[in-house]
C-alpha cells in the first residue's frame, strides 16, 4: 500500500471515529429520567441545572420527554390553547381551569386570575413558548380563585403575562 493510500485510509478511519464519538457524546449528554424529574418538580425560583435546561432547549427528544413528564404531573395542561380577547381581558381554558388576564388601570400591574370549580388548585404554573419558559408559584387559593400580579418589574411575571397572551403558548398547571 502506498503512503498516499495509507494516509487516506487513516484519515477516513479518524473521521469515522470522531463522528461516532460525537454521536456517543451527544447521547450521553442527554439528562437521565431522574434529572428530568428533579427539574420538573423543582420549586419556582429555585436553583436549576443549566445542563438540563440546555438539553431540554437544544435536543428535541429531551424537550418532548420533559413536556410529557410535565403533562403527567400537571393537574391540567394545554399544549396549545385558543386565546380570546376583547381588548381588556384575555381568557384561556386549561383543563378544568379558567385563566384570565385582567388589564389594570392607574399604573397597577395586570392580574392573572385562575379559577376552578374542582377541589384541588394548582400550586405552580409553567408556560412554554418557543425556547422561553416561565415558572411561577401561584400561592394559596381564596374562594376557588388564585390571583397573581403580573408586575412588569418582576421579569418572570412579565414574561408569563406576555407568553399567556400568545395562543401558541403551552401551559402546565402543577
Question: Where are the regions a protein language model picked out?
Answer:
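N-terminal amphipathic alpha-helical interaction or autoinhibitory segments
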Residues: 1-67
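Transition segment at domain starts
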Residues: 26, 64-105
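C-terminal, beta-strand-rich globular interaction domains
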Residues: 89-174
